[in-house]
Amino acid sequence: MLELKCELLTREAFAPFGDVIEASDAVKHFTINAGNTERYHDLADIHVGQDGKAIVSIFRGQPRVLPFIVSMMERHPKGSQAFVPMSGRPYLVVVADPKSAPGAKDLRCFLARADQGVNYAPGVWHHPLLALQETSDFLVVDRSGPGDNCDEVPLTESAVIRALG
């Protein structure tokens, strides 16, 4: 079984899969509200398609235990999907290139800090929520609308995540 090594989540490394949502000097930001608030502006490219609308939900993820076997992936072809952690804990992100059916050799694992969210671009293969340590809440912005917007596939060969670093 292929072992996945987790890398730290960065904007550059995650760019082929979507956006990293974080308050960073690397993004456009400016002061508003008479100087009392710093706005980190336009952090994610949200897609909902012509017939969809953006919705905001909270997902409550149960903690995953390592070693963890990655045996399936999913994607949302009609819209993006953003996850922003609310519980102050790191979590894992597993993704694969949207251009082909994912295999274990195509997977990448990222360790996201508690202050980093992710926005999966439409069609990007990803593993469902991978909370760590304790039950964790995530603010989710995704698409509601007609049509099937969730494809799930089993992997022909599984991969294992044994450690965070």
Question: Which functions belong to the PLM regions below?
Answer:
Residues 1-109, 133, 141-142, 146-156, ...:
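Non-catalytic, conserved peripheral segments adjacent to functional cores
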Residues 81-84, 117-118, 129:
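His/acidic/aromatic-lined binding-pocket segments of jelly-roll/cupin-type domains
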Residues 92-93, 119, 127, 140:
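Short hydrophobic/aromatic-rich beta-strand segments that constitute the beta-sheet cores
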Residues 111-125:
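Conserved metal-binding segment of the jelly-roll/cupin
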Residues 123-139:
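Ligand-binding loop in jelly-roll beta-barrel domains
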